[in-house]
Amino acid sequence: MKKILILSLFFFSILHPQIRAETVYDLLISGEREKGITILRDLAENDNNKDAMYVLGLLYNDASSIDLCSTEDFCLGQNFSNYKEAKKIFTQLYQNHNDPRAAYALAEYYDDHWYFSSNYKKAFKYYLFSAERGVPEAQFNVANMYEHGDGVKKDLTQSVRWYLQCNNTSLCGAGVDGIDDLIDQLTGEQYELAKSLVVNDMKEVDIRITTARQVVSQ
């Protein structure tokens, strides 16, 4: 399936050492990861901070690729990210806060993830929840799954609808040119229905690690 799987795309850069770390993101990318992680845990466990919980889940998910295996319990053994803990955090965030970012993360775990067993029906469920709440990557994946009938009954009207929805975002934005072959397979009535289902004022939700910029460090 040609879907967008980006949960593990997490890169650290280096801040100038004299720049004051005002957010957890600053701490994470400036070499003060332990301090940043301590703040994240405190906010997640004591303040029920959704952003802190989400970023903590990302750190567990990407631990092996960002050199966190020597830190606390971020890895299983020496080389593998602690996906179990990441999934636990995302599940709590989804169940307790209806967080669309967490739903997207869970969808990826069921969508051809090497550590967890694939379950396209569950993947579609979480992608759809996320897509309906503004995550562009999920909107693209839902469109793709409707197009190919993966985890859901094939429905080209719904596929076009979700591709069009994603086209309203910074992720897609290619217009109808990329899906004209699908549109050609619809009747005029079906195409009008697909367009009518698009929510033009849907707020875009960012699932990247830069969410940590919203978490103040002090």
Located regions from the model:
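Hydrophobic face of amphipathic alpha-helices that form TPR/SEL1-like repeat modules
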Residues: 57-67, 73, 103-112, 141-148, ...
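Alpha-helical tetratricopeptide repeat
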Residues: 18-25, 54, 100, 104, ...
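Alpha-helical adaptor scaffolds
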Residues: 76-79, 83, 91-135
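Terminal, low-structured helical/coil segments at or just beyond the last alpha-helical repeat
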Residues: 173-218
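Sec-dependent N-terminal signal peptides
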Residues: 4-13
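Short helix-capping/linker turns of helical repeat alpha-solenoids
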Residues: 32, 45-53, 62-67, 71, ...
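Structural signature of tandem alpha-helical TPR/SEL1-like repeats
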Residues: 31-38, 66-89, 117-126, 153-161
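TPR/TPR-like (Sel1-like) alpha-helical repeat modules
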Residues: 74-81, 154-174, 195-203
